[in-house]
Amino acid sequence: MGSLSTLNLIKTCVTLASSEKLNQPSQCYTISTCMKSSNNPPFNYYQINGRKKMSTAIDSSVNAPPEQKYNSTALEHDTEIIEIEDHIECIRRLLRTAGDGRISVSPYDTAWIALIKDLDGHDSPQFPSSMEWVADNQLPDGSWGDEHFVCVYDRLVNTIACVVALRSWNVHAHKCEKGIKYIKENVHKLEDANEEHMTCGFEVVFPALLQRAQSMGIKGIPYNAPVIEEIYNSREKKLKRIPMEVVHKVATSLLFSLEGLENLEWEKLLKLQSPDGSFLTSPSSTAFAFIHTKDRKCFNFINNIVHTFKGGAPHTYPVDIFGRLWAVDRLQRLGISRFFESEIAEFLSHVHRFWSDEAGVFSGRESVFCDIDDTSMGLRLLRMHGYHVDPNVLKNFKQSDKFSCYGGQMMECSSPIYNLYRASQLQFPGEEILEEANKFAYKFLQEKLESNQILDKWLISNHLSDEIKVGLEMPWYATLPRVETSYYIHHYGGGDDVWIGKTLYRMPEISNDTYRELARLDFRRCQAQHQLEWIYMQRWYESCRMQEFGISRKEVLRAYFLASGTIFEVERAKERVAWARSQIISHMIKSFFNKETTSSDQKQALLTELLFGNISASETEKRELDGVVVATLRQFLEGFDIGTRHQVKAAWDVWLRKVEQGEAHGGADAELCTTTLNTCANQHLSSHPDYNTLSKLTNKICHKLSQIQHQKEMKGGIKAKCSINNKEVDIEMQWLVKLVLEKSGLNRKAKQAFLSIAKTYYYRAYYADQTMDAHIFKVLFEPVV
């Protein structure tokens, strides 16, 4: 093969980067380009891995590639490594000081707090710092709201609230006039605004503020504009959906917008107050309640917020559950969660303390109201980390055959249903509610995509539709961690993401540019290590004469990709390469046995030598193919230390016996691979009863998936449809997921190896070759920018 540097390879294939369709890679892209030998190191090898000479690295690692230690002294002065360490430390500080959650200030809620009169009877605000915050944070155009993103709903509801607060105390008249002018000149924009981006409760609270402004004699606002009449009509429709007798008895979403309601019976409503004194964690709703009731718990809640935010108030608080769940989700999907294992464990322990199998969770702890978004995310992450949670909690959000974020919602949107879909994929056997949720969510999201109606009610993100599209095309069983990360790094909005509540808001623990930058740096670092290992794999391929066994370079690349797409960490090079090589060596042996020219005597002689011979170094001198097999396996085993080598050799002996008996199918290969992985990771647990149960189930699943893959290949695997329609396999996968995720006496990492192997078999059976080739390029060769 000719020489081609990785840098040139990237330039050749870079047009694929613009193709987001999983099943339609760029026309100029061919996987064979990526398989050409490279005598040059990866483009950033010296930046990432110190300045070791390439020839030395290759020569010393044909059998066991060197691990590029994260904390190696040789890397201390490397710019990217220092940057990675700085980002990790910055994020650790952020996570360790999460408290009740970080969230931006809402002018609207701050204005409502500023309306509270002095408790001692003076004609002044009880919280002058809130009044000062309002006065100090008007934008140059006269409005209040998110400085960097213009949403007319957000700007208008914030501005009318701040104008009312300023006029109530007869201060800053010029600021009032600028605000009134902004409302007058921009209220017509509501006619063409995206309804999906309407702030929460806008149709309830905006008319109420207009009425208050009009009763105060504030002139210049077009109170009778047609668009305002439409908003009043929307208000009436919403209030009819949730009758007032229900509002006074049950915790509904209207508790979040009490300031927009009339004729309230406060004695009844105070019974629905949250333990922290708030009404559904809303400062504005709670401020309105305090104005009418002088309830001490309401006051304490407001006082704490004003102190915490130095006069300001967010639209909701606390956000400890929401912030923790979404932070963990982002860190996991960005592929950087391994740097923050203790912080993630603490986050999920906190969430679990406030989880209810009867109700679920809300954005803030101890809420009397829950929603499907937080509950779905909590269900998925808690289950994934070994906590017992009951998915039947989702029945609270199901009416007839539909799921909704919460009762009374007028318009269902994409992001909560997408989180429901993701949670539904961690189904255990017999969990019908998750089966129903999966079918509903997939259909709902597919229809949204097809009709291009993916704008969301809760999140403004440039790549949300792409994220959902990829999520539907990549079911969890068939998703490799590095493939998911390669897409999500592009889809993740970082600090540009804007959340929609009563006003627009930002969440630093969720939408964070430092997360994204660390993910990019880490991905590049891992990718450079993988590219280096691929060079070793190609040298190994040639030196072991694999082409003579009918094994193509493409097959070796795919085997290595499955390993590196799952075990991607730089420090796990030994496990990753052992996985890939064990798959190829087993293929070599089966290829030798399946050759028509191989006699029975030759087969038996090779088996005897592999099983009982010493497999000494002198065998490398043999020129026949059986000698190559012996030498290759010897070389592989010598890459392990003596104790580990004994364990791996025992696994190979078991597999070779199955070859002898004609039972070396996909399940046997999976067992060999899993044992090798766990042995490399010093997980010597094969005598544990749970280990044997997992092994048998994984073997069974992988055998069936191998048959499905073979059938698809016979029908034309290159462009075959990406799907698996086998109910039996799916049920067995549910059992495997249950055994792996539920806590037991078996080490979690050892159990995870079984699921990882099974998912690679599912991946191969699910995707067409063309799609797999696109993933290979994206994970191993496409630059991350």
Curated annotation (Swiss-Prot):
A motif (DXDD motif) lies at residues 371-374. Mg(2+) binds at D371, D373. GO terms for cellular component: chloroplast. Coiled coil: none annotated. Gene3D superfamilies: 1.50.10.160, Farnesyl Diphosphate Synthase (1.10.600.10), Terpene synthase, N-terminal domain (1.50.10.130). InterPro entries: Isoprenoid_synthase_dom_sf (IPR008949), Terpene_synth_N (IPR001906), Terpene_synth_N_sf (IPR036965), Terpene_synthase-like (IPR050148), Terpenoid_cyclase/PrenylTrfase (IPR008930). Its cofactor is Mg(2+). One of its GO terms (biological process) is gibberellin biosynthetic process. The keyword Chloroplast applies. Substrate binds at K238, K457. It catalyses: (2E,6E,10E)-geranylgeranyl diphosphate = (+)-copalyl diphosphate. It is found in: Plastid, Chloroplast. Present in both leaves and flowers, with higher levels in leaves. Its main location: plastid. Transmembrane segments: none annotated. One of its GO terms (molecular function) is terpene synthase activity. It comes from the Eukaryota. Keywords: Chloroplast, Isomerase, Magnesium, Metal-binding, Plastid, Transit peptide. Its EC number is 5.5.1.12. Pathway: Secondary metabolite biosynthesis; terpenoid biosynthesis. Pfam families: Terpene_synth. The Asp-Xaa-Asp-Asp (DXDD) motif is important for the catalytic activity, presumably through binding to Mg(2+). Belongs to the terpene synthase family. Involved in the biosynthesis of labdane-type diterpenoid including marrubiin and other labdane-related furanoid diterpenoids with potential applications as anti-diabetics, analgesics or vasorelaxants. Terpene synthase that produces (+)-copalyl diphosphate ((+)-CPP) from geranylgeranyl diphosphate (GGPP). PANTHER family: COPAL-8-OL DIPHOSPHATE HYDRATASE, CHLOROPLASTIC, ENT-COPALYL DIPHOSPHATE SYNTHASE, CHLOROPLASTIC. This is (+)-copalyl diphosphate synthase 3, chloroplastic. It comes from Marrubium vulgare (White horehound).
